[in-house]
């Protein structure tokens, strides 16, 4: 066998810099297990179809098993001269078992081989990402259960809006990560199709059985067009897109944790295990983990744009540009998994300052909407009620009062429809618990959602 699998057509050796520039072994070596797994299934199929003998297939499989063991033990030296993981393994196989190893590549191209490897790899990674999402959801759910009844300010425009339960806030993020898990499950369906058998681009002249290989490798089916099979990276783009949404959710939560842990809010305390100090200011406790996750979100967005840009103008079928699919994909996987793992632990160990949350909720006229709703129930159109309460708030600001501190006489100065029962509607508890409809912040509504989430999780176990 020539050193290069394609060297027969060439009269000059590859320039050393070109060799290094075009090699992908430095990053695609992480696919070794999947490359060997796919090759074993391919060898079994070749034997089953009579394309190679059973003895040859067994020799190939035994050789691949020994190579896998070498790599796992760290006894395999990867070569840049052999370009990629596929040729590194094939060259070692031929070196180990002789020319029969060269029969493995019958009815196969590196184009459909790499498409298979990435799908096998990404299939496992999607499962792992979903398991990390489950852990983040569990941490959020435990915080919601543990702190049911704790009232905090809800915000719009980062201005105090209405009182809500802290548990309601945690369950909002639970829903976000729940959708993320659904997206990953949906993407898995499109990943889990076998591209092997497409050859370089047009299929193969050998009587292969793609469905048998798909069954061997646990795929739901086979891809339907050979050109598309080797040129498709939609599944990787979809993963990077869904991963970007995961990171966006983590980044939003990071921003809130950073604010909440500051001295100005002091709603939460992050465990010391997830914070660092300052080299000059001894009092500092910096929320480095959420800050880094917020920063890494941009990195994952960049990976998505990188992959989209690689694919945007490629004619069918395979092009060398597509070698650039792996680094953004691999980096996205590593970043998302790391971020989810650390967040699950950080949220679980976070402690709540319930008194500070309640105190903040009592400021900023958070029950003003409840006053407006009260006036509406007295028969006043909402827009008129809105103006009445707006004037009431302005009066409170001018006289340095909270709404609940107004006397009945002061209330009546703005509307004769306000009676002494107004005070039953403008406590923080009354405001929160009046929002009982599904999805609302009332304790009974939030408790229902926590229970539903618990039931769903039990059913998935």
From Swiss-Prot:
GO terms for molecular function: argininosuccinate lyase activity. Pathway: Amino-acid biosynthesis; L-arginine biosynthesis; L-arginine from L-ornithine and carbamoyl phosphate: step 3/3. PANTHER family: ARGININOSUCCINATE LYASE. It comes from the Bacteria. Keywords: Amino-acid biosynthesis, Arginine biosynthesis, Cytoplasm, Lyase. This is Argininosuccinate lyase. GO terms for biological process: arginine biosynthetic process via ornithine; L-arginine biosynthetic process. Its main location: cytoplasm. SUPFAM superfamilies: L-aspartase-like. It catalyses: 2-(N(omega)-L-arginino)succinate = fumarate + L-arginine. Belongs to the lyase 1 family. Argininosuccinate lyase subfamily. HAMAP family: Arg_succ_lyase. Its EC number is 4.3.2.1.
């Amino acid at each position: 066998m020539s050193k290069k699998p394609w060297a027969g057509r060439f009269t000059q050796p590859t320039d050393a810099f070109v060799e290094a520039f075009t090699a992908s072994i430095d990053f695609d070596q992480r696919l070794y297990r999947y490359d060997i797994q796919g090759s074993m299934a391919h060898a079994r199929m070749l034997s089953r179809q009579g394309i190679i003998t059973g003895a040859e297939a067994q020799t190939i499989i035994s050789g691949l098993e020994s190579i896998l063991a070498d790599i796992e033990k760290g006894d395999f030296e990867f070569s840049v001269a052999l370009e990629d993981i596929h040729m590194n393994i094939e060259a070692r196989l031929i070196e180990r078992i002789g020319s029969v190893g060269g029969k493995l590549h019958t009815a196969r191209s590196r184009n459909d081989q790499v498409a298979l490897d990435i799908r096998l790899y990404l299939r496992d990674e999607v499962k792992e990402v979903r398991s990390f999402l489950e852990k983040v959801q569990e941490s959020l759910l435990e915080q919601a259960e543990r702190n049911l009844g704790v009232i905090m300010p809800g915000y719009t425009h980062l201005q105090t809006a209405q009182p809500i339960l802290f548990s309601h806030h945690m369950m909002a993020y639970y829903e976000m990560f729940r959708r993320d898990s659904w997206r990953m499950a949906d993407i898995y369906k499109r990943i889990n199709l076998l591209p092997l058998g497409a050859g370089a681009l047009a299929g193969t002249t050998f009587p292969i059985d793609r469905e048998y290989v798909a069954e061997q490798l646990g795929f739901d089916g086979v891809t339907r067009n050979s050109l598309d099979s080797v040129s498709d990276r939609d599944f990787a783009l979809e993963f990077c897109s869904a991963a970007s949404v995961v990171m966006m959710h983590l980044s939003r939560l990071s921003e809130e944790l950073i604010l909440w842990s500051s001295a100005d809010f002091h709603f939460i305390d992050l465990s010391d295990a997830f914070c660092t100090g300052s080299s000059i200011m001894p009092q500092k406790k910096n929320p480095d983990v959420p800050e880094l996750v917020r920063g890494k979100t941009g990195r994952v967005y960049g990976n998505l744009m990188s992959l989209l840009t690689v694919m945007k103008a490629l004619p069918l079928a395979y092009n060398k540009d597509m070698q650039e699919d792996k680094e953004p994909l691999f980096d996205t996987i590593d970043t998302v998994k790391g971020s989810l793992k650390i967040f699950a632990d950080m949220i679980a160990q976070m402690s709540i300052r319930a008194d500070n949350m309640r105190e903040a909720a009592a400021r900023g006229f958070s029950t003003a909407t409840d006053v407006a709703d009260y006036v509406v129930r007295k028969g006043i159109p909402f827009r008129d009620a809105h103006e009445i309460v707006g004037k009431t708030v302005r009066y409170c600001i001018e006289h340095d009062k909270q709404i609940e501190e107004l006397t009945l006489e002061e209330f009546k100065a703005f509307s004769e429809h306000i009676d002494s029962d107004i005070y039953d509607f403008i406590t923080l508890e009354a405001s929160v618990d009046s929002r009982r409809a599904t999805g609302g912040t009332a304790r009974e509504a939030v408790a229902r959602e926590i229970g539903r989430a618990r039931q769903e999780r039990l059913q998935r176990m």
